[in-house]
Amino acid sequence: MSKIIGIDLGTTNSLAAVWQDNKSVLIPNAFGEYLTPSVVSVDENGIVYVGKSAKERLATYPEETASVFKRFMGTSKKYYLGNRAYLPEELSALVLKKLKEDAERYLGEEVEEAIISVPAYFNDMARNATKRAGQIAGWKVERIINEPSAAALACQNAKQMEEATMMVFDFGGGTLDVSLVDCFDNVIEIMAISGDNRLGGQDFDDMIAEYFIKAQGLDASELSPETMGVIRMCAEQCKRALTENQTAQMTVNCPQINAAMEISRKDVVNFCARIFERMGKPIRQVLADGHISVEEISDVVLVGGSCKMPLVQQYLAHVLKRNDIETIDPDHVIALGCGVCAGIKERNVQVKDMLLTDICPFSLGIAVENPANPVELKMSFIIERNSPLPFSRQHTYFPHADYQTQVDLQIYQGESLYVSDNLALGKLEIEIPPALRVRMPIQVRFTYDINGILEVDVDIPATGEHKQMVIVNEELSMTEAQIQAKLREFEQIKMNPAKDEKNQYIMDWGSRLYMQCTGELQQEIGRKLEYFRYEVRRDSHNLKRVQKYMMVYLGVVEGMVNQFINLSENDWKDGSWYQEETEEETQENREIEDEFRNWEKENYDDSE
């Protein structure tokens, strides 16, 4: 039996896990790292890059690179890369395809089945789009699991809590979910969920970038896409620096801007006040839905990379009136939980008795007549939010008027009284024979499965007619044949080979730093990159050593750029910056530096 892979398909980063050796194990990518940036780029030759190299291209080729597309899953938004347009689910499929390749390389066998996590507040269209993305990437999607549920599984598996009431605060790059979880015996019961699908760490990046632009007296509309890409990247670096320090220097070096300014945590609190306000709303909602007070929560668990921000932790400590807030590997915990779920699906003896009960995060219903205002249709709720999954409920309705011959069943998701304020999911047109309305009952059943996908059944007892539909975005829905055709199409896409991935990353990283620097340092970077290209082209026995050398060299240059340090030429030119653990490795570095100098003399004269 092939392994089932658990996947955290994130807004900023994605990663995978597998149940192995009686535990959930993270799967490394080609760099030996667990986090793969959820970024896709296409070059002039139509070759697709996914992950670290694609992320570097955000600054150098912003119009050929896409990120944060998870926020638009289930919509018809298009990203134009290379010579074609991609839907968010197609870009996600490329990320999932990359994770599949990494998993197969790590396990040494083919894998086909996956469990993919989604934000609890993803609507039905986004969930269906996620499932299609997995299928297009070549996966058989065993289950769609809510991210907080996966996090709860990981926590329960790690801590073996006998009884606890947890609040899981899942704050990632692009989404926020807040859940109440009841743990007892081997049961994990999700009690209530609330969230915001358009709030995440990326919003802090955007606000820091906006603050910097205004402080420099610039107009964002006059800046090139390349410059905006550099500013956003520097804003993210500034945010990360503020994780460790009270203040951070934000430095932007590129053709249009050469400036630096200090930003403090207090500054972020002030200009991101709206973000913190939005963070508080789901917390209040989930406590109300769970009929529970702050004092009754035994554990608060932080999930998602954005929870590493001290300001987020301080805000939660204030709102929840406690200081014992846990961060259990925020970047990895969802993937680890998906790995546990994979172990349960495989019936592994260590976890086969664990039971996860999930809930429906939204209310679902249909539009009905509003006698008080015929123009404004009301929402008739069939499934209320926080109902346990799987869940099925039937309501009986009647036509609007006597002798009506057609009924339009309009299906909505949301909590508002009026359907105009809720999300339209789909519509069923039903033909009925003319009769008195009281003699023409229409039975409507909603069934919400464990993947959070809605199925609607309609029965007309008077005629025996039955209609059924699975809610999908009709504009984007695909038949099985269309999915298979798309799978074959994606198999033909030229992906950057895994063996070239590190080389491409070094080139993209170096190209971005080259663009950010000026003068002698820029020339030095350019020549190092030319030398690296030379070594790659001839596939020399030195290549691995040169890769290692370039990674350290570019890391030092990155530090110089970020800190706005004005170093002397010798600080970066003589190789003394390269520190290694052993004398042998230090000697290796000197040899590579000498080889570079010899190559440089042969290819550049003194006048350049």
Spans of model-derived segments:
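Oxyanion-binding/catalytic loops of NTP- or PPi-dependent enzymes
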Residues: 1-75, 79-85, 94, 101-608
